[in-house]
């Protein structure tokens, strides 16, 4: 059976914000498939690695299914690759959340707990700042776009050339990374109304696909009306 129709592969390793990501791509007219099949991942036009919860548990589940190698191979082949939330953190080498656990190591630095003098977790709507002027990831997004965050860890030590955006939560935190075919979003674009859909549409475009205009999509997802972005973070938990 030919499964090549799965143009974007969302890596299913038993943990993560899977269906929400799939529905978000569908909202911009892009077909995405939840899969743990390495052959499907290898032939996809783009690969998405979601993640929620604990870095060590996520990496353990990925390794157990031999999907860490599938992710490495996809990146090495030049397939567009997007890590979301813990999926972005898994692109790094290590995390203080799980000493001894080894990440994918695409970015050779550590993920650390947010400073003790800030509210943890960083949860709710916040604005991305310091957008890289040549960022394809944030193409078409207005200055300081609102995105939805839920995280307690972030990488404080990232090569500035790879930083696509930052966010201020008591301190400046890396909100997104962009390096060649690899993107990482610390926030949840699939939970971030039309601005998040714009970012996913940008990703689909890099995959050679033709997404629909995100402004025509209904991206409410229970958190905000489309195009309405609160001035203060929303205190609510994402249920995945």
Regions found by a protein language model. Give the residues of each.
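Acyltransferase
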Residues: 5, 185-240
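Structural signature of beta-strand start/N-cap positions in the alpha/beta core
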Residues: 31, 80-82, 146
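Cysteine-nucleophile active-site neighborhood
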Residues: 53-126
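Pocket-forming structural segment of enzyme catalytic cores
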Residues: 93-171
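Beta-strand-turn-beta hairpins that frame and shape the catalytic cleft
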Residues: 144, 178-183
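Short, surface-exposed beta-strand/loop micro-motifs that present aromatic residues
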Residues: 172-178
């Amino acid at each position: 059976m030919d499964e090549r129709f799965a143009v974007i592969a969302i890596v299913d390793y038993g943990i993560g914000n899977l269906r929400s990501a799939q529905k978000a791509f569908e909202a911009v007219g892009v077909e995405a498939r939840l899969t743990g099949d390495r052959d499907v991942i290898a032939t996809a036009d783009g690969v998405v690695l979601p993640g929620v919860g604990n870095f060590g548990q996520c990496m353990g589940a990925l390794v157990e299914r031999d999907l860490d190698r599938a992710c490495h191979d996809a990146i090495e082949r030049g397939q567009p690759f997007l890590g979301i939330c813990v999926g972005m953190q898994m692109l790094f080498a290590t995390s203080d959340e799980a000493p001894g656990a080894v990440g994918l190591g695409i970015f050779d630095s550590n993920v650390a707990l947010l400073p003790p003098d800030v509210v943890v977790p960083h949860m709710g709507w916040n604005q991305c700042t310091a957008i890289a002027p040549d960022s394809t990831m944030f193409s078409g997004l207005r200055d300081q776009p609102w995105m939805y965050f839920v995280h307690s860890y972030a990488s404080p030590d990232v090569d500035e050339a790879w930083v696509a955006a930052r966010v201020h939560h008591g301190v400046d935190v890396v909100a997104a990374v962009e390096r060649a075919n690899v993107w990482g979003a610390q926030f949840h674009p699939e939970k971030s109304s039309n601005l998040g859909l714009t970012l996913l549409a940008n990703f689909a475009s890099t995959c050679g696909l033709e997404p629909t205009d995100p402004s025509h999509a209904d991206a409410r997802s229970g958190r905000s009306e489309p195009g309405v972005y609160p001035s203060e973070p929303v205190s609510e938990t994402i249920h995945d």
